[in-house]
From Swiss-Prot:
GO BP annotations, alphabetical order: translation
Keywords recorded for this protein, A-Z: Ribonucleoprotein, Ribosomal protein, RNA-binding, rRNA-binding
Protein name: Small ribosomal subunit protein uS11
Keyword RNA-binding among UniProt keywords: yes
Domain of life: Bacteria
A GO MF label: rRNA binding
Length: 128
């Protein structure tokens, strides 16, 4: 019989400083925690956290998504986070507050929302 290969346990790399990218659209909030080079350590979304439909685009859903991404990244030994916020959605501030409450020291908050220099025509105004 053939020998079964010896399986070694994969060692998790220890990262002290990281970056949190919060993409807050009007429909959903995506939180990705990366290392300094941009390699993703963990991520979570409001939709993947159990919220569907209009509840997905609430600040509470963004808070839950940020908590889930933060707890998943704690096994890498993260202490400090630099936060990059993109988008106009309702979960911008609550995601940053949730990361702060998860025990991370937030060193810097940067808004990286893309602003067009008169590029594409925006969608028409809603008539409700």
């Amino acid at each position: 019989m053939a020998k079964t290969p010896i399986r070694r346990k994969k060692v998790k790399k220890q990262v002290a400083d990281g970056m949190a990218h919060v993409h807050a659209s009007f429909n959903n909030t995506i939180v990705t925690i990366t290392d300094r080079q941009g390699n993703a350590l963990s991520w979570a979304t409001a939709g993947g956290s159990g919220f569907r439909g209009s509840r997905k685009s609430t600040p509470f859903a963004a808070q839950v998504a940020a908590e889930r991404a933060g707890t998943a990244a704690q096994e890498y030994g993260l202490k400090n986070l630099e936060v990059f916020i993109k988008g106009p959605g309702p979960g911008r501030e609550s995601a940053v507050r949730a990361l702060n409450a998860a025990g991370y020291r937030i060193t810097n908050i940067t808004d990286v929302t893309p602003i067009p220099h008169n590029g594409c025509r925006p969608p028409k105004k809603r008539r409700v």
